[in-house]
Amino acid sequence: MNNVNGVIVGIDIQDKITQAAIWDEQTEMVIHVTGPENEAAFLNPFEVPGWGQSCNIEAACEFIASIIECASKCAQGRKAGLICITIADYEIKKLNFISEVMKRLQFNSEQWSVISHEESFAFYAYSQKKGLYSAGVMLLDYSNDDAILSLL
């Protein structure tokens, strides 16, 4: 992470909302990114199935650009150097769509990545002390409608 030119931005695209945070290397803290009106989450311009439909590409570009702009404001004007996007549906159509969005926003492929929610959770869980996960790790993903249990 020492070679990152700018702040590290995490963008979590969920069904109806998106949340974002930055990693501040100076304070070694995660800072939650708020929206233009200081809201805690960004309302998606379309639901998750829309990520991948070419008719939504311009709206997606504007949406991601606004999140990156808000992240820069939270970082006292420092620009995004590395962006990690997490998504629930890890499908090639959506990955290509996000790739096109990032290309249009003039981020090269070394400046961003996409991982699934499960990968993000596993990375977090397994980066903890081994004693915390040696007996196994359980991922509980829940919404208002249901809960999904996965053992890692």
Question: Where on the chain are the PLM-derived regions?
Answer:
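A generic structural signal for beta-strand entry/edge sites
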Residues: I17, E39-F42, D146
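Glycine-rich phosphate-binding loop of actin/hexokinase-like ATP-binding domains
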Residues: H32-T34, Y133-L152
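Short, surface-exposed, polar/charged, turn-prone segments marking secondary-structure boundaries
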Residues: P36-A40, Q111-V114, D141-S143
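Nucleotide/phosphate-binding catalytic cleft detector across ATP-hydrolyzing
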Residues: M1-D15, Q19-A20, E25-M29, W51-M138
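Low-complexity, flexible helical/coil segments
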Residues: N44-P49, E119-Y124, I148-L151
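Short acidic-glycine loop/turn motifs at beta-strand connectors
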Residues: I22-T27, A40-F46, L152
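Short, compositionally biased "basic patch" segments
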Residues: G35-Q53
